[in-house]
Amino acid sequence: MKTKLLYGALLTALMSVSSLTACGSKSGADKYDKKGRLILELSNVYFGGSNEESIPAYDGADTYTELINERFGVSIKPTAPSYGSWDEDVSRTITGRSLKDVVHYNVKAYNFGTSYEQWVRRMDIKALPDDLSSWTNLQSMLNNISNLDALKINGKLYGIPIANDISNPGKDFSNMTYVYRRDWAKAIDELNASNPDYQPILKENDVYTWEEFERLLRAFKTYVDGTKENNDVVLIDQPWGFPSITNFYKSAPHCFAKDASGRAVNNFTTNEYIAGLEKAQSFVTAGLYPQEQFLYTEENDNAYKKYAAGLAGVFYDNFSFTNYGKLRRALKKNKDIDNVDDAVAFLKVKGSDGKFALEGTENWFSMTMFNYDISEKKMNKVLDIIDFLLSEEGTRLAVYGQEGYDYNVVDNKVVLTDTGWEKDPNDLSGKTYIYKSNGAKSLRYMATLGNDYKDYDPYTEADIEAYTAVTTWQNEMKAAKTAGNLRVVQEPADLSWMSTPTKNEATEKLLNKSKAYGTQYCYKQPLDTREKYMNAVNGVEEWATTLSEMNAKLGK
């Protein structure tokens, strides 16, 4: 949404009276602790820890934070918004003028105009220095951020996009895909082994053509109806991804696409998207998508719970390492499952064009932003810390801890110490380390999500099977892309990040309403004809105005 905000004389006037009108919350002298160290108030959603992974909230009281405090002459005071109300908490903080020195917000295309861009205009957040040459590691990371220019306003960048994986910046596809019950496929093949005319449904390396995928689903349906005793179903999607079948048809992932002339159009009314909806509708009619999918909600997490209980054959979700590991752990507790690898195998489906299809993604997620009123000294300290944590030395501190106590380097290899890394006595495999708070790792999340060190993080060892499965799938998709066998479904960047008055305000509404109408059309409740679906989607009044504004900007 590259936008030129032409403040002109008005901006000059505003800045001249910034003490009266600036929207940052904490103008005035910097504060210091009893040791004379500069106090930094930093907020990040990842500081909140994780109940699922038994990780407590980061409070800044650990040894490694103190090492950073001493190194940089600061006193770090971390806080975290609630993950469940992250956007609302940050927006309320900014509106209420209670912004910390550093804030973390889930900036994305659909909320760009009503958050980031608006906060720049109101002088709530501060631009990064034009010259980042003093922070070479940070500069190197930013050089690889996708669509970085879209985030610049008048040539300035107002925050740090948090990189997904600084070791793999070229990955432009999401982890939103299928897992399936390979053990069901094996069982079905075994049941039919005596039939000389039977063709096995299980495919090598879990790769299925479109026809083979449909045959697999129908075989699962027969299996569920005739063999299973529980309330089993065939194919389920996370509600935000329903119907996932459209991925193999649509040319854009969400609201906006381009027609042959380059005009912006409503993606939900294109022939490609409707063809995908109607294919999904046929899956509903055939019982491949269950009736209960219609009632699934993100709040209740129905789809995850269904698959985790062992009651579904195929599941579509965002399979990050964390999400995939969580699902594996849940299935391991199921006494009816003998082999968890077979219960949660990655299902690789090729569309009718012979290609895999995955939604595209930016190579970053959310942004670290600075209070407009933060002093230059404070801002530079935060940038110094981030740059250090992106260095080899800082990364080692984040991953292993303190050299000489937590680990030693022997023959150029890191060797963990027993004092620094205590094994969990309850894990008979000997792979699990007792969790310890490491502020360096937490603070590093202000710049990157830590996927660059997952393969050598000691904590990964306890979930090495999950990590191996996810990385193997990712590498296979990267190879498929290189070979021209992966279609990455991207929204054109000039549409995605474009800023117009109605688009800024209405995109989330357009997305939610259009997807809801798509679900109603798939289930014919109540939209039982294509005409009714089209009328419902086009009837959302903001569509016409939004597209008109966008095409005016495109000169179409």
Where are these regions (language model features)?
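Extracytoplasmic/periplasmic substrate-binding proteins
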Residues: 239-260, 281-441
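Conserved small-residue motifs centered on glycine
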Residues: 388, 392-520
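Positively charged n-region of N-terminal signal peptides that target proteins for export
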Residues: 1-8
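Conserved N-terminal structural module of periplasmic/extracytoplasmic solute-binding proteins
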Residues: 23-180, 184-202, 247, 265-266, ...
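Helix-loop-helix "hinge/cap" segment bordering the ligand-binding cleft or interdomain interface
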Residues: 154-242, 258-306, 315, 369-381, ...
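Short helices/loops that flank or line small-molecule/ion binding pockets
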Residues: 87-99, 113-117, 212-220, 300-315
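Short, solvent-exposed loop/beta-turn-alpha elements that line the ligand-binding surface or hinge
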Residues: 126-144, 187, 191-194, 254-272, ...
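C-terminal motif of bacterial Sec signal peptides marking the signal peptidase cleavage site
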Residues: 18-22
